[in-house]
Amino acid sequence: MRRLLCLLPLLLAACSSPSGNASTATDIPAMQTIDQTVGAGAVAKSGDTVEVNYTGWLYDPKAPDHHGKKFDSSLDHGGTFTFPLGAGQVIKGWDEGVAGMKVGGKRTLLLPSAMGYGSRGAGGDIPPNAALVFDVELVSIK
């Protein structure tokens, strides 16, 4: 009985460990961009209004492509998303990660939480301090 009481705190600590918690966020140290297709059109720069298709996932270090749970996609909403590049109207990772893309280009953005939603997270889909993955296609520059 005494041995059981000694093991009980260890068991409770193991059960409360964040490694078993599905909502625990994984972060990465810096932004990474991977061009899937470079594109052949004009180059997006700060001040341009850009039109993109995108899909966003939580970063998963165990997945080969780091694409975890999908949380949003312009394709699910039936259209593109338009925003002024560099104006701070989207997350920092988008302002920095879309800049330099060519029209027709497709790029994967791996974003640390500080370039996404940081310690606040977003709604019920993006936990605090979560790294994000976005596949972005630059459709046009307006």
Task: Go through each PLM region and give its residues.
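Cross-family detector of peptidyl-prolyl cis-trans isomerase
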Residues: 2-142
